[in-house]
Amino acid sequence: MTLDPQTPVLVGVGQVNQREESSDTEPVDLMAAAAREAADPRVLQAVDSVRVVNLLSWRYRDPGLLLAGLIGAADARTRYSGIGGNTPQSLLNQACVDIQAGRADAVLLAGAETWRTRMRLRARGIRPDWTKQDESVPVPPGGEEKVPMSGPGEDR
């Protein structure tokens, strides 16, 4: 039996935990480090779609665009999720569907938070000097989705 070439396959997993306080390490740097831990540089360069779970600790217009540049996949399409507890799984599901349909060949899913660093810096009156994307950078698909945090039954 031959495997369909468009069968989604998980190639690697990477996780980076930043234990020390560093005002220099921003969320997109953590995502790039995790990506490098997950896959060989040649695999990362082949990524044609970067999908990022919504970040709460720092605002980027398109974090996937920054991440794609850091891993050498500058031409990758990007997607940014809305806020919600199941968004990582939703991004994975959609990546598999897109690979099966031939809309993507290699998808990188990423996410990162630097909340502890932000709060420690804030307590000292310091604002991180992290990447600020110009407002002219378009928000990628998914980035403006409004995900309700409660259903009609809960709103009563």
Language-model-detected regions and their locations in the chain:
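Conserved "HGTGT" condensation-loop signature of ketosynthase/thiolase-family condensing enzymes
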Residues: 1-81, 96-101, 111-156
